Amino acid sequence: FSSNLGEPMAAPRGRYKCEAERHVSNLWLRHSMRWRRFAIAASAGASFTPYGTSVSWAVSGRYGNGGWQAEAGAAQSMRLPTFTDLYYTSEAQVNNPNLKPERAVTYHIGGGYAIEKWHASVQFFYRDGRNVIDWVWRDELTIGDRTLYDKWHSEQESHLGTFGIEASGGYRSDGGVVRSATVSYGYLTTSRLSDVRTSSILDYMRHKLS
């Protein structure tokens, strides 16, 4: 229930005038195996939603030799529109109840090294997002018999490519004053492959140090 998100209720309950619901079921199968210094894992799943059945998958592999380790993998994912995406509207924003799920495939490759009390790792990843939902600016847009001017519209016309790097190094000990310390750095850059003006899709932290 909500005061402004969802479909209008036949009989309001107090300050709640809108309602919406959806049921989601998930099924996942996963298998992993080891052979000498190699480890492989794969999974497949299905999500049953009001938008239909969505199939997802993931595969990864890892190789270790002494203190060295290398890994790579890929995974497909899906994100359902939130009720805010579907129903929120204001003087400057127009909702869209016809949104569909976002879909993305993420690839990653990386490695690490550990010796005695010290460890370090680095990982590169790329996410190919399709039908990404965001608020898109339209100078003029006709919806049915209405023409709206200068508003943000909830749409999913963005094709988004995201590249990132994550690196970390640290120290760990069972004794002493300082038992552990870790330094990590992350870099992220995003390129929108659709020529539209969006509100928040490119609002992210490019560099992160902790």
Question: For each of these PLM feature ranges, what is it?
Answer:
Residues M33-A39, Y126-D128, R146-S210:
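Gram-negative outer-membrane beta-barrel transporters
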Residues R13-E19, R30, S47-T49, N95-P101, ...:
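Outer-membrane beta-barrel proteins
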Residues L27-M33, A46, V59-Y63, I109-Y113, ...:
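Residues on the lipid-exposed face of transmembrane beta-strands in outer-membrane beta-barrel proteins
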Residues F1-S3, A42-A46, V59-G61, A72-Q76, ...:
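Transmembrane beta-barrel strands of outer-membrane/channel proteins
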Residues S2-G6, R13-A58, G61-H108, F124-E155, G175-Y185:
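Surface-exposed extracellular loop regions of Gram-negative outer-membrane beta-barrel proteins
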Residues E21-S25, T53-V55, R103-Y107, A114-E116, ...:
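Residues that define the transmembrane beta-barrel architecture of outer-membrane proteins
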Residues F1-Y16, G52-W57, F83-S90, P97, ...:
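Outer-membrane beta-barrel translocator domains and adjoining extracellular loop/strand segments
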